[in-house]
Amino acid sequence: MQLISKIKEELFFARKMIQYRYGPRCWYRYIKNKFFPVFLTRRVQPISIPVNCDFEWHIMTPKRGLWMTYWAIRSFLYQSNLCPKIIVHDDGTIDEATARMFESKFSNVKILRRLDADKFFDTTSNIPNIIKRARKSKCFFILTFLDHFFLSNSSKVMITDNDVLFFGKPQEIIDFMLGASKIDAMYFVGEGEGRNALPVDSLYKKKYADILDDAARLNSGLIIFNKSKIKLESMVEYFEHATDFDHHLIEQSGWGMILSQIPHAFFPEATYKFRGGVEFPVIFKHFTSPRRHEMFAYGIDKVRQQINS
């Protein structure tokens, strides 16, 4: 069944690349970047940059996503001139040797193994039981909500997916992390009129009616927040009113509801994007599943060219 799914995925991407007339070079890049992630990561030279700012960046990735993660990190370090402590969360597929290899490529990166994260939640007594129960959700992405929050150790935190790249200077992030912003959270939003379903009951929706629209717009591909402003009680309340812990948006709607309760803003839609090209003035692009081929076919090499120019 998994093989059939992979074949269908590749046929989908092939049709897209044919439809938009991708040339031989893009096909070569797609094959190279997608199918040889660990091999390519092993070959890159280590980068040693001292941590120069007081915030943490948390990313979760499978082993096959390490090449994407590598370029997400490289693009941010280059464009922002910030060097935070970066914690890459293992989804359970990264072996010890591969984890140590990836850590060796950056002086500021630590891989947190899934087993260690599981042990933390199992043995930490002051985490409410409802949080521990929610973490056992069938929706894998719940880990990018709970693990990234509870395992972060700085007041300011950035969270991204691993399928993101920065193509310009992220001034909004720089200002926030350096204390030049008056808000306590900023997040990436869906383009246009798109809204997410919020799997919460009517009482909760009524109580927070004034922020529901903002919460429903959040996309968790890029969020930044002041952790000290988020109350544990707010997270507990969200799960107490969640209608289905296994809902596919339980994580994303959770971030939306929690972050929308504190002073917040959206990243500008004109420069932080899902769709379209990556030329100026685009700063950031989230290469979500239907557009993942774009990251492999031209996104990674665009970043490489910017860094080497």
Feature-to-residue mapping (PLM):
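Membrane-proximal basic amphipathic "stem/tether" segments
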Residues: 1-52, 296-309
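Cell-envelope/extracellular polymer assembly enzymes that use nucleotide-activated donors
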Residues: 56
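Active-site beta-to-alpha loop of glycosyltransferases that engages the nucleotide-sugar donor
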Residues: 61-67
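Short, acidic, metal-binding catalytic loop of nucleotide-sugar glycosyltransferases
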Residues: 75-83
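Short internal beta-strands
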Residues: 85-92, 187-189
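Active-site-proximal specificity loops/subdomain of glycosyltransferases
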Residues: 99, 103-151
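GT-A fold catalytic core of metal-dependent nucleotide-sugar glycosyltransferases
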Residues: 145-196
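Catalytic core and acceptor-binding pocket of nucleotide-sugar-dependent glycosyltransferases
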Residues: 192-193, 212-292
